[in-house]
Regions:
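Non-catalytic C-terminal interaction segments of nucleic acid-processing enzymes
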Residues: 3, 10-14, 23, 162-173, ...
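Active-site metal-binding core of divalent-cation-utilizing nuclease and nuclease-like domains
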Residues: 53, 85-87, 102, 106-154, ...
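Nuclease-adjacent, charged terminal/linker segments that flank catalytic cores
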Residues: 1-82
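Metal-dependent nuclease catalytic cores in nucleic-acid-processing enzymes
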Residues: 95-102
Length: 233
């Protein structure tokens, strides 16, 4: 049903990598018309490989892969995305940022994909250390998205709301000290931007962490420190 239909394969691949997206993001990322995207999504949901959820008034439905869909995508190591009312807007924003980065020519992966790769490798690949977990192991913070390329990866965070100041400083400090990534980009709303800038000043992290308005998603700045990142990272 899927391997002979390149557009369905593209939808499977994108949802497996990013996690969730509306029909609009899938159409844009897979090069399909809205009508063609809708027809394929209906067929895929009927076949049990995707499910759709509409939990936010005025927002489009989000589509995610089921376990059957992950197997069809060749990604059985990934867990299905859990969609909640509280996290719906963030998942939608992450999908839109992923499309913008993809349209700008970047290879983009999601947080679940990164988690699976790090589990398989037995080490962090593009995560920040943020202290110790309850069991005494290093606690990791993973970004929402990762831009992969020939050099060090770029961690992408999508910040819609304001985190508690202490928690935000801890995350920013972890990113500032990380030598696994070439830099970190926060695409943020105005309130989140103000909080992030305070955290950046507090942690002297401006050379490693950039804050960009959410409506400019897709733009990636240069980072002066990328040349010091080991190529094996």
């Amino acid at each position: 049903m899927y391997t002979h239909d390149r557009s369905m394969v593209a939808i499977l691949d994108w949802l497996a990598a990013i996690g969730a997206g509306s029909a609009g993001e899938l159409a844009a990322s897979c090069g399909l018309s809205p009508r063609a995207t809708g027809a394929r999504l209906r067929a895929m949901e009927d076949a049990g490989v995707t499910r759709s959820l509409r939990l936010l008034h005025g927002a489009p439905a989000l589509h995610v892969l089921t376990r059957r869909g992950l197997r069809a995508a060749g990604r059985p190591e990934l867990d299905p995305v859990a969609v909640s009312a509280s996290g719906f807007a963030h998942l939608l924003a992450v999908a839109r940022v992923a499309v913008a980065l993809g349209n700008a020519g970047h290879r983009v992966g999601g947080e679940r994909e990164l988690r699976a790769w790090e589990r398989a490798e037995g080490r962090p690949l593009a995560s920040a250390e943020v202290g110790l977990a309850r069991d005494g192991t290093v606690a990791l913070h993973r970004p929402d998205l990762v831009c992969w390329g020939a050099g060090a990866p770029i961690a992408i965070e999508v910040e819609l709301t304001v985190k508690a100041p202490a928690r935000l400083r801890t995350i920013v400090r972890g990113w500032a000290r990380s030598r696994l990534v070439g830099g970190v980009v926060y695409y943020a709303t105005p309130p989140a931007t103000r909080a992030l800038r305070r955290a950046l000043r507090s942690e002297c992290a401006g050379d490693r962490v950039a804050v960009i308005p959410l409506d400019r998603a897709g733009f990636l700045p240069g980072f002066r420190s990328t040349s010091s990142i080991p190529s094996a990272a």
